[in-house]
C-alpha cells in the first residue's frame, strides 16, 4: 500500500520515537539515493498524486526482516518488485490504484500482477484478488492477469477472465532476457 510521509511519521511516533515529518522525508530520500529503496508510481493517478504517493520497496528483501516480525508476504511482494524492475526498469513498472488495487502493472506488456502467499485454499483472498482483475478490465480490457504465490499453481477463470496462478520460484525461472541498456 502506498505510504505517505505523514503516515510513516505517525507510525514511528506511535512506536515511541520522537521524529518530525521533514526528518522522515530526509531519511527516505537518503535511502532512495543510496539505492536501499526504490519507488513505484501509480499508473492510474494524475501527475501530482503520482509524485506524492509512491509505493516503496527495498532493494534487499532481508531489510524487511529487520523491521517486520511476520514478513513473508511483504518479502514476496518485494521480491516480485525487484524482479520486475530487473526485467523492465523502474520507469516501466507501476502499481495501479483507481477504485482498483493491482500490486504491479507493466503497460508495455499489459501485464497485471497480484502477489499473495496463497489463494487456492483461502476463498476470501482468492475472491479479493480476482475481483480486482475484473475491475481492472474496465480500464484495460486486454490485460494479462497473473497471481504470484509462494507455491501454488493453477489457472482460474473469473468474470470471463483467465488468471494464471504461478509460484514465485517458477515465475523467477521463466525470467526473460534482460534488455540491453
Predicted region positions:
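Domain-level recognition of nuclease-like catalytic cores that cleave nucleotide substrates
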Residues: 151-181
